[in-house]
Amino acid sequence: MNIHEYQAKALFEKFGVLVPKGAPAKTPEEFVTALAQLPEGMIVVKSQIHAGGRGKGTFTDGFKGGVKVCKSKAEAREAAGKMLGNTLVTAQTGPAGRKVQTIYFNVGSQIKKEYYLAILLDRATSRPVIVASTEGGMEIEKVAHDTPDRIFKVHVDPAYGLADFQVRELVFKLGFTAAEGKNASKLIRALYRCFWENDASMVEVNPLITTPDGQVEALDAKVAFDDNALFRHPELVELRDLNEEDPKEIEASKHELNYIALDGNIACLVNGAGLAMSTMDIIKHFGGTPANFLDVGGGASREQVVAAFKIILGDKNVRGILVNIFGGIMDCNVIAQGIVDAVKEVGLELPLVVRLEGNNVAAGKATLATSGLKLVSGDSMADAAQKIVKLVA
């Protein structure tokens, strides 16, 4: 689960991380209240969406920049008015962009130098890893590609926690002065506590800055949490912004389906994440474009299959459907019955290709064969993929 920058900074403050003073607003009337909380001078106006690249983004009406540095409150209010309710397109939103429904006003900071700092889960080592760089304010992927020697990594033993020597190592490699180093050490420890105690999957600050008076501030904040651990943090669940999520993905989660919308026109219904990714790959291989990732899991019920079809058909870009099932735990006949019920309920008019293999496959194929449905059978994954690509061409 992702949260907005203003929410992440509020969380940071609870752990003692220094952040610029700020205030969010959701309406033009709230602009006045929010700005009244801030001192006169430079104000940074930030669009709040769950995507990066806001500063370089463009709104659909042509207004450029989802982050604006303003010299006065009047200028900040004017910029916020152009952002609120507008749709911001960035490199991470896709062409559809995201509608801005919250504005975050920040007091401007005096920047001496910018850094990058993030805490992530390294699945290769099964440990948290702190990633830091002297090149802040830039895309970390570009830094890793162009100047990999400027990125430092410290893996943390979860049984022991973040050690003092590891903090000192980071402070030394990042080149902080003695005065800055004390504040940086405090901030790094606070960020790690925030990461660990909230079951976060990512805490990112880009940029982390030093100021002329030796302070170390989190100028930006991005936090994501492990969905599987949210039951331990009901206070974090309240921060979820459903407006930032695809309605189809929200509906899928209600039925315990793993769904991610994509930009293609061939919908996929598959059991198992690995098979789902392979199915998308083979569709691309034969010239098609997948419309989604949809894993119904190893023990889906008939009701879940019906729900999956309804979610798929909620995407207006879908021109055909490929069902690819390999039954291990999954009973192929349950899938087949779900397909029959779903098609009859929603009145499917799109091409449908079904490939079934594995547990109780004979009964599943018999159910489909006697259903009277207009569908195409696939003898193999490659055969099924070729058929659906041809049908939607």
Swiss-Prot record:
<feature type="binding site">
    <location>
        <position position="206"/>
    </location>
    <ligand>
        <name>Mg(2+)</name>
    </ligand>
</feature>
<dbReference type="InterPro" id="IPR005811">
    <property type="entry name" value="SUCC_ACL_C"/>
</dbReference>
<feature type="binding site">
    <location>
        <position position="220"/>
    </location>
    <ligand>
        <name>Mg(2+)</name>
    </ligand>
</feature>
<comment type="subunit">
    <text>Heterotetramer of two alpha and two beta subunits.</text>
</comment>
<dbReference type="InterPro" id="IPR005809">
    <property type="entry name" value="Succ_CoA_ligase-like_bsu"/>
</dbReference>
<dbReference type="GO" id="GO:0000287">
    <property type="term" value="F:magnesium ion binding"/>
</dbReference>
<keyword id="KW-0816">Tricarboxylic acid cycle</keyword>
<feature type="binding site">
    <location>
        <position position="46"/>
    </location>
    <ligand>
        <name>ATP</name>
    </ligand>
</feature>
<feature type="binding site">
    <location>
        <position position="271"/>
    </location>
    <ligand>
        <name>substrate</name>
    </ligand>
</feature>
<dbReference type="GO" id="GO:0004776">
    <property type="term" value="F:succinate-CoA ligase (GDP-forming) activity"/>
</dbReference>
<dbReference type="InterPro" id="IPR016102">
    <property type="entry name" value="Succinyl-CoA_synth-like"/>
</dbReference>
<dbReference type="Pfam" id="PF08442">
    <property type="entry name" value="ATP-grasp_2"/>
</dbReference>
<dbReference type="GO" id="GO:0005524">
    <property type="term" value="F:ATP binding"/>
</dbReference>
<feature type="binding site">
    <location>
        <begin position="328"/>
        <end position="330"/>
    </location>
    <ligand>
        <name>substrate</name>
    </ligand>
</feature>
<comment type="similarity">
    <text>Belongs to the succinate/malate CoA ligase beta subunit family.</text>
</comment>
<dbReference type="GO" id="GO:0004775">
    <property type="term" value="F:succinate-CoA ligase (ADP-forming) activity"/>
</dbReference>
<feature type="domain" description="ATP-grasp">
    <location>
        <begin position="9"/>
        <end position="251"/>
    </location>
</feature>
<dbReference type="InterPro" id="IPR013650">
    <property type="entry name" value="ATP-grasp_succ-CoA_synth-type"/>
</dbReference>
<feature type="binding site">
    <location>
        <position position="109"/>
    </location>
    <ligand>
        <name>ATP</name>
    </ligand>
</feature>
<keyword id="KW-0479">Metal-binding</keyword>
<keyword id="KW-0067">ATP-binding</keyword>
<keyword id="KW-0547">Nucleotide-binding</keyword>
<feature type="binding site">
    <location>
        <position position="114"/>
    </location>
    <ligand>
        <name>ATP</name>
    </ligand>
</feature>
<dbReference type="GO" id="GO:0042709">
    <property type="term" value="C:succinate-CoA ligase complex"/>
</dbReference>
<protein>
    <recommendedName>
        <fullName>Succinate--CoA ligase [ADP-forming] subunit beta</fullName>
        <ecNumber>6.2.1.5</ecNumber>
    </recommendedName>
</protein>
<comment type="pathway">
    <text>Carbohydrate metabolism; tricarboxylic acid cycle; succinate from succinyl-CoA (ligase route): step 1/1.</text>
</comment>
<keyword id="KW-0460">Magnesium</keyword>
<keyword id="KW-0436">Ligase</keyword>
<dbReference type="InterPro" id="IPR017866">
    <property type="entry name" value="Succ-CoA_synthase_bsu_CS"/>
</dbReference>
<feature type="binding site">
    <location>
        <begin position="53"/>
        <end position="55"/>
    </location>
    <ligand>
        <name>ATP</name>
    </ligand>
</feature>
<dbReference type="InterPro" id="IPR013815">
    <property type="entry name" value="ATP_grasp_subdomain_1"/>
</dbReference>
<dbReference type="Pfam" id="PF00549">
    <property type="entry name" value="Ligase_CoA"/>
</dbReference>
<comment type="function">
    <text>Succinyl-CoA synthetase functions in the citric acid cycle (TCA), coupling the hydrolysis of succinyl-CoA to the synthesis of either ATP or GTP and thus represents the only step of substrate-level phosphorylation in the TCA. The beta subunit provides nucleotide specificity of the enzyme and binds the substrate succinate, while the binding sites for coenzyme A and phosphate are found in the alpha subunit.</text>
</comment>
<dbReference type="GO" id="GO:0006104">
    <property type="term" value="P:succinyl-CoA metabolic process"/>
</dbReference>
<dbReference type="GO" id="GO:0005829">
    <property type="term" value="C:cytosol"/>
</dbReference>
<dbReference type="GO" id="GO:0006099">
    <property type="term" value="P:tricarboxylic acid cycle"/>
</dbReference>
